UniProtKB/Swiss-Prot annotation:
Disulfide bonds: none annotated. GO terms for biological process: translation. HAMAP family: Ribosomal_uL23_B. It comes from the Bacteria. It comes from Prochlorococcus marinus (strain MIT 9301). The keyword Ribosomal protein applies. This is Large ribosomal subunit protein uL23. PROSITE patterns: RIBOSOMAL_L23 (PS00050). The gene is rplW. One of its GO terms (cellular component) is ribosome.
Length: 100
């Protein structure tokens, strides 16, 4: 059983993921964010709706295993990363890039 993640909604969303795949998903009104690894889908949905004033249709999450990193003979682990793909309602938009 997982522990509940009790925090402010602003702490759930870390940053947007800007890759080629995530940029192509913008055409389908899907936005990709890096979120806290303890956050659940309802918390992610509530955070996106509160921070950006949009209507969220669906949330898909990816929680890959931590990657190991080696420096010389010392081995360590990178921080846990969880990604959320958020699908917005028709007509809603999130401004990720500044217009110039």
């Amino acid at each position: 059983m997982s522990k509940l993640f009790n925090s402010r909604l602003a702490d759930v969303i870390r940053k947007p993921v800007i890759t080629e795949k995530a940029t192509n998903a913008l055409d389908f009104n899907q936005y990709t964010f890096e979120v806290d690894h303890r956050a659940a889908k309802p918390q992610i949905k509530a955070a996106i709706e509160a921070l950006f004033s949009v209507k969220v249709i669906g949330v898909n999450t990816m929680n890959p295993p931590r990657r190991t990193r080696r420096v010389g003979k010392f081995s360590g682990k990178r921080s846990q990363v969880k990604k959320a793909i958020v699908r917005l309602a028709e007509g809603d938009k999130i401004q990720l890039f500044p217009e110039s």
